[in-house]
Amino acid sequence: MNEKTIILANPRGFCAGVDRAISIVERALEEFGAPIYVRHEVVHNKFVVDNLREKGAVFIEDLAEVPPGATLVYSAHGVSKAVRQEAAERGFRVFDATCPLVTKVHKEVARLDAQDCEIIMIGHKGHVEVEGTMGQLAPGKMLLVETVGDVAKLEVRNPDKLAYVSQTTLSVDETKDIIAALNARFPNIRNPHKEDICYATTNRQTAVKELAEQCDIVIVVGSPNSSNSNRLREVAASRGIDAYMVDNAGYLQRAWFEGKNKVGVTAGASAPEVLVREVLATIRGWGHETVREGEGAEESIVFVLPKELRREGETKPDLCKR
């Protein structure tokens, strides 16, 4: 009889950008007291957001909800230039929790625009990161593509002055297909200096592919509005096995595991390890008692906090190396 085993993906859970964003809100609360206003959910995870709300964070979408002189934090997903300008005009104390890898894309957009390139954004319409990146330029200046099919519909000013950037949390495989379609239609399109999909997204997708090869079912811990968590579930499902995404252990269904000997568990980049442990406890209680860690890429990158929120010893260069 096959042993009932749970295999944990590595890496999984929090990435450096999420760690930094949560720390910025927590440090701001410690330094300046509640309330601290946060534009949009600082990361897309219900547990994290609820926990910060209990500590005094107030999550808003419209800066009109923020009183004069208040402290405001931008979410990890980044904001448009219009939001930055409005915050400056209103005189808020601002801390920017935008992931540095998203900021890198913003800088790439500015550089390309200065060179008079028309820019195509590969991403999901309505996602806050996409809105922030496209908002680095005036409305209508960037073109959005979500699928390979969208590439054929593009109308560009000059195919020889064209470039693309990507949302950082996309499926690596799907994005490759879109990039291939762009290069086929526009042979002179400029590629980013460095891949836009972040290291954490890539590493977690690679790990879940390996997990899917070993397991009968994969559980992804993540909130429904988390782009990278959704992509993990899709990647696992594309391997032909059952794959489910759950916000926490309460969403697990015992019937999913009937007849399944090997269960894979991973977590999106915004999902804390405490939720993974609760999921493990529930599945173990249903008979999958053996747990082992999978092998995968080691991650050592740490992004430093804004200087106003740093503590002694947090300015060393080795704290932000890969």
Curated annotation (Swiss-Prot):
UniProt keyword annotations, A-Z: 4Fe-4S, Iron, Iron-sulfur, Isoprene biosynthesis, Metal-binding, Oxidoreductase
Keyword Heme included in the entry's annotation: no
Positions that bind isopentenyl diphosphate: 44, 77, 127, 226-228, 270
Pathway: Isoprenoid biosynthesis; dimethylallyl diphosphate biosynthesis; dimethylallyl diphosphate from (2E)-4-hydroxy-3-methylbutenyl diphosphate: step 1/1; Isoprenoid biosynthesis; isopentenyl diphosphate biosynthesis via DXP pathway; isopentenyl diphosphate from 1-deoxy-D-xylulose 5-phosphate: step 6/6
UniProt-recorded name of the protein: 4-hydroxy-3-methylbut-2-enyl diphosphate reductase
Catalytic activity: isopentenyl diphosphate + 2 oxidized [2Fe-2S]-[ferredoxin] + H2O = (2E)-4-hydroxy-3-methylbut-2-enyl diphosphate + 2 reduced [2Fe-2S]-[ferredoxin] + 2 H(+); dimethylallyl diphosphate + 2 oxidized [2Fe-2S]-[ferredoxin] + H2O = (2E)-4-hydroxy-3-methylbut-2-enyl diphosphate + 2 reduced [2Fe-2S]-[ferredoxin] + 2 H(+)
Binding residues annotated for dimethylallyl diphosphate, in chain numbering: 44, 77, 127, 226-228, 270
Domain of life per record: Bacteria
Organism lineage: Bacteria, Pseudomonadati, Pseudomonadota, Betaproteobacteria, Neisseriales
Species per Swiss-Prot/TrEMBL record: Neisseria meningitidis serogroup B (strain ATCC BAA-335 / MC58)
Cofactor dependency: [4Fe-4S] cluster
General function of this protein: Catalyzes the conversion of 1-hydroxy-2-methyl-2-(E)-butenyl 4-diphosphate (HMBPP) into a mixture of isopentenyl diphosphate (IPP) and dimethylallyl diphosphate (DMAPP). Acts in the terminal step of the DOXP/MEP pathway for isoprenoid precursor biosynthesis.
Cofactor remark: Binds 1 [4Fe-4S] cluster per subunit.
GO MF annotation, one: 4 iron, 4 sulfur cluster binding
Matching Pfam families: LYTB (PF02401)
Keyword Metal-binding: yes
